[in-house]
């Protein structure tokens, strides 16, 4: 924040130190076409609401995870070939369904010739690398490597991605990363239109992620029935 003070004989500019962050918030989008700035509206509205309630929105450090560009090229290439090769009707519906279902299929589908099992696909690894880079950026830049309570906000399929990412961090933690980057400061998991239950039907035993971390002093669980 910059304050300008005029003493009558000239203008002096004072740069105030940045306010320390008290909460970190990671936002990830769901299925369908998205833009890199998908989270801007959410951040602006939440910040405005915090201000209305008498809280300084500057104490929240925000970071978004954009991954649509990883899966989009293959889907767009297929649609282009399909539309050029046949006079297909209902193109808007076809495109919508392919983008929605294609994200889920491309995230975990094994490449041809690979054995079925616990192996991750290249897309799975690339998307998780995008999450890892976002968490690292959040920790090292706005937080200045100072851990604070960590909340994730996920829409639709983004909740499934983050759940898998947290699971991997808990089962195969990277000892070179900080406790914050290993998701040990996770204090809240907020989802919108979460479809995680759909991905449990193939499991003989559903084992959830450990949440909250034993180091968290308090947790609040809430579900909206609407």
Cite the ranges covered by each PLM segment:
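Active-site catalytic motif of lipid deacylating hydrolases and related acyltransferases
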Residues: 32-36, 45-48, 56-146
């Amino acid at each position: 924040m910059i304050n300008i003070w005029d003493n009558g004989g000239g203008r002096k500019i004072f740069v105030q130190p940045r306010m320390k962050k008290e909460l970190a918030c990671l936002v990830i989008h769901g299925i369908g076409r998205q833009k890199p700035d998908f989270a801007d509206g959410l951040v602006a509205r939440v910040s405005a609401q915090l201000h209305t309630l008498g809280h300084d929105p500057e104490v929240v450090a925000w970071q978004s995870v954009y991954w649509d560009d990883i899966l989009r090229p293959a889907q767009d290439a297929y649609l282009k070939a399909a539309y050029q090769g046949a006079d297909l009707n209902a193109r808007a519906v076809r495109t919508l369904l392919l983008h929605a279902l294609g994200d889920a299929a491309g995230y975990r589908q094994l490449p041809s010739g690979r054995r079925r099992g616990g192996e991750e696909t290249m897309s799975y690894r690339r998307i998780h690398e995008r999450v890892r880079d976002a968490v690292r950026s959040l920790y090292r830049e706005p937080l200045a490597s100072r851990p604070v309570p960590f909340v994730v906000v996920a829409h639709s399929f983004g909740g499934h991605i983050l759940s898998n990412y947290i699971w991997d961090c808990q089962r195969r933690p990277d000892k070179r990363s900080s406790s914050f980057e290993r998701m040990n400061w996770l204090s809240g998991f907020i989802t919108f239109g979460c479809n995680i239950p759909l991905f449990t039907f193939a499991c003989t035993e559903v084992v959830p992620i450990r949440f909250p971390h034993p180091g968290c002093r308090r947790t609040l669980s809430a579900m909206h029935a609407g």
